[in-house]
């Protein structure tokens, strides 16, 4: 059975004081919660501090992005080897903010995916459609294209022990969210699409939902059979709200 993952993407938020306070509160809030994996992805400059703050807890460390080069004259980049060196486990790639603001292509994201897998890091591949694409009925087409970039470059086996996060772009940071039924339909499509190449891999791949997940809608989302946790934005900056989401994922798994 798949183990849900709830991961907090802190985006461009944080300070030394905030990292300390938030992790301390989060450790207290989720102490004793089982049945759900938990990770946080702070800004890169706070990874080492976060590693120290989560020490001895069940919280795993994530990163918000990675470069594809391991070393060299690449000013401003962070290599996946560096992330591994500070005990990062999960690495978010393909987030819509990277695709939009940094013009990252499906092929470039597939390159990142491959490098992470080679180093034993877990890619968290973000996919999803814009509001215009959603209204035009192109959700499945867009998600298939983004998944196919990985399948074509690396094969279905690359999704073994990987994570996919379906994040409809129109729901990120907007307060809007797909209904549980809408999200489930897309998650099932993603799983079925991978299953065309490898049913066993498709069955075990974790597919998170992202896009204005909060403490109010998490439980209903997680009740759906193909939703395996969440990639959480704004709500991950509040320990109590994030903890409610973690607990909802754990409770939903116990019922499945």
Curated annotation (Swiss-Prot):
Kindly list the places in or outside the cell where this protein is found, as annotated in its UniProt entry: Cytoplasm
| N-terminal signal peptide | none
Q: Which GO terms describe its cellular component?
A: cytosol
Query: One GO BP annotation here?
Result: gluconeogenesis
Molecular function (GO) terms listed?
Answer: triose-phosphate isomerase activity
Q: What is its main location?
A: cytoplasm
Report the active site residues. Answer: 95, 167
Catalysed reaction, written as an equation: D-glyceraldehyde 3-phosphate = dihydroxyacetone phosphate
Keyword Cytoplasm part of the UniProt annotation: yes
Annotated EC: 5.3.1.1
> Which pathway does the database say it acts in?
Carbohydrate biosynthesis; gluconeogenesis; Carbohydrate degradation; glycolysis; D-glyceraldehyde 3-phosphate from glycerone phosphate: step 1/1
Q: Which family does it belong to?
A: Belongs to the triosephosphate isomerase family.
Q: What's the protein name? A: Triosephosphate isomerase
Species of the source: Proteus mirabilis (strain HI4320)
Task: Supply the source organism's classification.
Answer: Bacteria, Pseudomonadati, Pseudomonadota, Gammaproteobacteria, Enterobacterales
């Amino acid at each position: 059975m798949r183990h849900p993952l709830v991961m907090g993407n802190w985006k461009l938020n944080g300070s030394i004081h905030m990292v300390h306070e938030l992790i301390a509160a989060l450790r207290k809030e989720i102490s004793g919660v089982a049945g759900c994996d938990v990770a946080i992805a702070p800004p890169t400059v706070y990874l080492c501090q976060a590693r120290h703050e989560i020490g001895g807890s069940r919280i795993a460390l994530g990163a918000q992005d990675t470069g594809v080069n391991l070393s060299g004259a690449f000013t401003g980049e962070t290599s996946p080897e560096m992330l591994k060196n500070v005990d990062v486990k999960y690495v978010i790639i393909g987030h819509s903010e990277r695709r939009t603001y940094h013009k990252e292509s499906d092929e470039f994201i597939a390159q990142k995916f491959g490098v992470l897998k080679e180093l034993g890091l877990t890619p968290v591949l973000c996919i999803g459609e814009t509001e215009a694409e959603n209204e035009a009925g192109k959700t499945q087409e867009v998600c298939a294209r983004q998944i196919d970039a990985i399948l074509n470059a690396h094969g279905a086996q690359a999704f073994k022990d990987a994570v996919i996060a379906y994040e409809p772009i129109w729901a990120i940071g907007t307060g809007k969210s797909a209904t549980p039924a809408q999200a489930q339909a897309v998650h099932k499509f993603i799983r079925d699409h991978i299953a065309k190449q490898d049913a066993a891999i498709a069955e075990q791949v974790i597919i998170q939902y992202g896009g204005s997940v909060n403490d109010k809608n998490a439980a209903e989302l997680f009740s759906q059979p193909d939703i395996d946790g969440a990639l959480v934005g704004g709500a991950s900056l509040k320990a109590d709200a994030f903890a409610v989401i973690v607990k909802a994922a754990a409770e939903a798994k116990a019922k499945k």
